[in-house]
Amino acid sequence: MENERITWVECPRDAMQGVVRFYPTEAKVRYLKQLMHCGFDVIDIGSFVSPKVIPQMADSAEVIRQLSPHKKGNKFLVICANKRGVDEAIDHPGVDIIGFPFSLSETFQ
């Protein structure tokens, strides 16, 4: 099978959310700008989830707000674990794609 188009996706959110020490918003923005300039089609940039559960993602809305003016064809993907997160993501003009983690395992999430 031949692909006419491959979408290049980077997922820094997955790595960042597991880091215990909170990275400053400015550091995230600097790093993500570099990824944007690499030419990724989609960047999994943050999560609209409870900051009690994943504190590293508490600033996702601000990160996206700061990065949106610099988009050059990139699309921003965010993860939402519930309806509240989806509602917040839908209201954010910088969000292009919403991912919802669905698991068949009772021990995951």
Question: What feature does the model see in each segment?
Answer:
Residues V20-R21, G46, K52, V78:
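Glycine- and other small-residue-rich loops at beta-strand/loop junctions that grip anionic moieties
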Residues V29-K33, S60-I64, V86:
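Generic structural signal for well-ordered alpha-helices
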Residues D41-L67, F100-Q109:
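Glycine-rich, proline-tolerant flexible connector loops at the mouths of alpha/beta enzymes
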Residues A81-P93:
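Catalytic cores of alpha/beta
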